[in-house]
Amino acid sequence: MHHNSQSLSSGHIRSPEDENVAPIGNLKHRTGSLSHISSAHPRVALSDVTNIVATNSSNNSISKPKVAPIKERLDSAAIIEEERLDANSVAQRKEADHNDLLTDREQEEPVEDDGESEEDEEEDQEPLLLQHYASDTLVWEHAFRTYYRTTLDPNDDDVYDVVMVAELSNEIFEYMRKLEDLYKPNPYYMDKQPELRWSFRSTLIDWIVQVHEKFQLLPETLYLCINIIDRYLCKEVVPVNKFQLVGAASLFIAAKYEEINCPTIKDFVYMSENCYSRNDLLDAERTILNGLEFELGWPGPMSFLRRISKADDYEHDTRTLAKYLLESTIMDHRLVSAQPSWLAAGAYFLSKIILGQNQWSLAHVYYSNYTQEQILPLATIILENCRYASKRHNAIWRKYSSRRYLHSSQIVAKWIALAEHRVERSN
């Protein structure tokens, strides 16, 4: 449901002037970098990031780790495998879902700092890419023969919902899968950014998630915003003092594209703590759109998530839990170039495991277009990130701790704690 956005900076009635449009005198065609935008501002909301670069420019050069950390991924894979094979644990999982949830204090215990070497190791982790196996074709063909229909099924409720466009759904999703590959960012773009690191991207996204939640925007707006940022950074070098400006302008663009009533320029200036002016944001908006050649048709994962949930008759709890798991993926730079349909499938698959529904049926293969073998590596990384939620995606964890999202993040945290205990006990 779309939400009406209210200004956070003032309560009076706005003038008829449309502040989402730049003044006529400033409509100058600009492309390329953001260097023409003034940077003479008293402070930056991401000052912790800026100060790191300003005080020690040598940090811009990322050292290569000797050994990549693999223990977390192995432990996460063991948890998934244990839960898939242990049929007797279903009752325990259901009990865990209804027990008292973890408190904020328990979840947000300080994470032990292993020093700069651990941060560098995380910076240098390779992107996760979708793999195709020989058995995938056979499984997909079987699912296609079972569930594909040349005519509409009168027993399918979607046929009677004009919004679902059931007669064109197959062609629509086939086209969307082409778009997700067309607008896929380069996973190595950070190598060409002399002043930025992947950790800076995580800090920016953490702030964007909070602003997005404050404005009560649609999930599609958040995912499109992240895609705009990543694609723009693939094309242009951005200085660290303009990085937050790129994030704010990208969220403004995404809100215009996805929302019925998007926040105003004044709202974004307020949320950036007046670090940037109205004209700065409008100039950045034009620069980014010109850099992307106004190509904003990236499909995003939410439509694919709803499509997959059709295999379970649009079951609400599974999809809500999957939304948390899906949103956690935006923080991981290893998944920058991952297809949104694959991310949706991985989040939904892991959600089913957490809720004790261990079967990835032919219906799930058909509606997701992915087999269980293709999803397992992705689900392992998602689970790994959720095991260290306060470190990896604290703002997202807090967001999904609320009743509005059925306390999804707390349910996942408690399930992980119980699953780890069972794995340790079995060893």
UniProtKB/Swiss-Prot annotation:
InterPro entries noted in UniProt: Cyclin (IPR039361), Cyclin-like_dom (IPR013763), Cyclin-like_sf (IPR036915), Cyclin_A/B-like (IPR046965), Cyclin_C-dom (IPR004367), Cyclin_N (IPR006671), Cyclins_cyclin-box (IPR048258)
Any one of the GO BP annotations: G2/M transition of mitotic cell cycle
Gene Ontology MF terms: cyclin-dependent protein serine/threonine kinase regulator activity
Entry superkingdom: Eukaryota
Disordered as annotated region, ranges: 1-29, 89-126
Note in the entry: Present with 892 molecules/cell in log phase SD medium.
Protein role: Essential for the control of the cell cycle at the G2/M (mitosis) transition. Interacts with the CDC2 protein kinase to form MPF. G2/M cyclins accumulate steadily during G2 and are abruptly destroyed at mitosis.
Family statement drawn from the similarity comment of this UniProt entry: Belongs to the cyclin family. Cyclin AB subfamily.
Stated name of the protein: G2/mitotic-specific cyclin-3
Encoding gene, per UniProt annotation: CLB3
